[in-house]
Amino acid sequence: MNDWHESTRADYASKGLGSRSGYGVKPALLIVDFSNGFTDPASPLGGDFDQQVAVTARLLTGFRDGKLPVVFTTVAYEPDFRDAGVFIKKVPSLSILVQGSRLVEIDDRIAPLEGESVIIKKYASSFFGTDLDTYFKGLEVDTVVITGCTTS
């Protein structure tokens, strides 16, 4: 797999792609959908994300130690799914993610602290139909470090 990564990087570089722009001065951490519905292997949507959650916990500690903004997202629907739109038709298994259930709560291993935002979303994107963009702009965030298990 390492060879594939190296050849891809070389291919990008030869075409003038893949350069880095660097980091800004006001970063935030966005943790996408590390809720029990996705991190519990017993859940129909779940998998074994122990390694990913552990790495995220380290990132989270660094952001918290630096007193930097941290935002979590979770997918959650009203019990009658009137807020689910066509997405629930596309992905019917999401119907287990009902507001107030344990499955929509953030995994205890990285549980939000008081003052950390939890954005409830209805679709794959953390930005579509949420106030996340406004929240980041209000904090003048210029760099977002994204981790999670259902990012898009």
Feature names for model-found ranges:
Residues 1-113:
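Active-site acidic carboxylates
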Residues 35, 76, 124, 150-151:
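Catalytic metal-binding/acid-base residues of hydrolase active sites
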